[in-house]
Each structure stands twice: as C-alpha cells, then as structure tokens.
C-alpha cells in the first residue's frame, strides 16, 4: 500500500475521538505510528506550530530574535546567493548555513533558556504518543488506501 504524499488536515473530532486509543502490541506499534503520522500529518503540524507560536508570543525578545535570524537567513540564501568573501576566507553556502545554525542555537538558548527546546520536545512527544496510541477506524484506512491507489495510477499515467 502506498501512502499519500500530500499533507491534509483531518477532521479534529476524528483526530481526538476518545474511544479509539489503546496500547499497541510491540509488532503493531511501528505500523500504527507510520499510518497515523502519514494520515494525521496536517493535524500534527498544526499542533506543533500552535504550541511554538504560543511560546514565541509569550517571549517577545525571542520572537524578535527569531524574526531577525530568519531575515538574516533569507538575505544570505535568497537575496545574496553563493559564496561570500570575507577577508582571507571564502564562505560557501554550507559553511554559512552551519554558522547561522550555531549562532541561532546560541541566541535562542540565551534568550529563552531551554523553553523553546522543551516546548518543541513536548510537542514532538505528544505527536509520537498520539501516533502510537490512536487506532484508526476502518473508514480512515479505506480512504487512505484509495488515495494511495489514485496516486499510484496518476504516477503510472504520467
């Protein structure tokens, strides 16, 4: 069975449905997680984004720093593409990305302590726990199977 590559937001009442949770057997856990991560990917992205936005809006210094780092990244990688000559050194885009990443981690750590990292970690743990414990109903599995077949047919007809 092929999985759909598009990200769709599934209905929230189906996502939350309290009667559909159980602890999977060790053989079933990975399959259930893969299925749920594919099927509910839009919902998971929305949850992580909302939690991160709440964290950013409660810490204005961090929000300004993130926007500034994003603007610097945009300038480096989209406005002024290519190598940069700084004195005796040539900075390739990969080196620029590493430097920006290290500076970003340091700035975020200094401004938020570990709040942003903990927020991200808790969000991802929620996603993994939900994907492992949520049993999808037969209707959802059939819908996913049909969309996979449609995608396979589209790819073969191209």
UniProtKB/Swiss-Prot annotation:
Keywords: Membrane, Transmembrane, Transmembrane helix. It is found in: Membrane. One of its GO terms (cellular component) is Golgi apparatus. Its main location: membrane. The keyword Disulfide bond does not apply. InterPro entries: Prenylated_rab_accept_PRA1. Pfam families: PRA1. It is a multi-pass membrane protein. The keyword Iron does not apply. The chain crosses the membrane at residues 36-58, 62-79, 88-108, 113-133. PANTHER family: PRA1 FAMILY PROTEIN 2, PRENYLATED RAB ACCEPTOR 1-RELATED. May act as a general Rab protein regulator. Belongs to the PRA1 family. This is PRA1 family protein 2. It comes from Dictyostelium discoideum.
């Amino acid at each position: 069975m092929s999985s759909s590559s598009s990200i769709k937001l599934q209905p929230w009442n189906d996502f939350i449905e309290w009667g559909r949770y159980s602890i999977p057997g060790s053989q079933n856990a990975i399959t259930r997680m893969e299925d749920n991560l594919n099927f509910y990917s839009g919902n998971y992205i929305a949850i992580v984004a909302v939690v991160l936005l709440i964290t950013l809006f409660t810490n204005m210094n961090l929000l300004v720093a993130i926007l500034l780092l994003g603007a610097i990244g945009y300038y480096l990688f989209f406005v002024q593409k290519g190598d940069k000559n700084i004195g005796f050194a040539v900075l390739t885009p990969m080196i620029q990305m590493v430097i920006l990443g290290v500076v970003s981690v340091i700035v975020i750590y200094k401004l938020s302590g570990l709040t942003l990292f903990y927020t991200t970690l808790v969000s991802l743990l929620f996603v993994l726990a939900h994907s492992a414990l949520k049993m999808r109903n037969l209707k959802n599995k059939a819908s996913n199977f049909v969309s996979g077949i449609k995608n396979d047919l589209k790819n073969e007809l191209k």
